[in-house]
Amino acid sequence: MTLRMNDFAARIGLLLIILVAAVVGLRSQQSQGSAFLDFVSRRVEPASSKHTFGKFCPVDQSRFARKIFIEYGAMFVASSDVQLPTSCYFADEAALLKFQSTLKTSSTTLDGVEIRLQAPAMASFLKVLDAARQLNVSISPLDGSIAAARSYSDSVSIWNSRFQPALVFWASQRKIPQDDVDQMASMPLPKKVEKVIDWETGGLLFGTGRRRSIFSSTAPPGTSQHLSLIAFDIAGKVTPLITALFNANGWFQTVSGDPDHFTYLGVFEGELPKRGLKQI
C-alpha cells in the first residue's frame, strides 16, 4: 500500500512512503502520511528549535536517509518521556556515544545477561516480564545483551554478518561485478546502502540466508533503534499472547519482516493512529 503525502510531504520531497508497525500481532502501517510526518516534525523539531526537518533526516536529498526513515522511523512517534536523537541516524561512534551519555538508563538481568534500556522503557519492560511470569510465559533475549542496548561497533558487526556473505555469494554467481565489490571497502556508508537498495530492488537479497531483505534482518550501522535503547528482540516464537503483553505496555513491532523486534513507543494502542500508524 502506498500513501500520497500532503503539502508537507511535498515540501520535503517525500511523495510516497510506507512505514510499518504492528498492533496486537498485526502488521501496521501509516494511516495518513501527513499525520505521521507532521507528528514526527513536531516531535523532533519543537517551535523553539532552529533545526529543520531536512537537517534531522534529509529524505529529500538522500535515498539512504529516506530508506532508513521508512524502515525504522516509527520510533520517532514515541511518547515525550522517551529521549530521541536529533538525527535519524548516527554518523559514527562518537555521535552515538555523545547521545547515549545523555540518557537516563536502567538495567536488569534476564537469562543471565544484562538488559539495558532507557529508564521509561525499562519500567515498562519489567511490567511485561512480571505479567509474563504470572501467566507462565517465557520471554528471552535474542543473542544475549544485544537484544536491547547496542554499541556502534555492534551495529557494524551485525550488518557485516549479513552483508559480507551475501556480497561474496552474489559476486560468485556473477550477479555483482567484481569492480563493485572492490569499491565497497572505501565507499561511504550511505552510498554503500544505496547500492544495496539497488541490488535488492533487482532481486539480489542480502538478508539472512538471502531469503529476505537485509533491512528487515538488521539495520545499517548507526541506524538501529537499539542504539537509542528503546528496542528489544525476543528469542523463539512470538505468540499472540506475548505480542499482547508487550502492546499493553507500550511496546510494538515496528520493523517490516522482523516480528521478533519490539520498539518502546510508550503510548496506548488507540493513540497510534493519531501519530500516523494503523493496523494492516
Report each predicted region and the residues it spans:
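Extracytoplasmic cell-surface/polysaccharide-interacting catalytic and binding patches
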Residues: 4-280
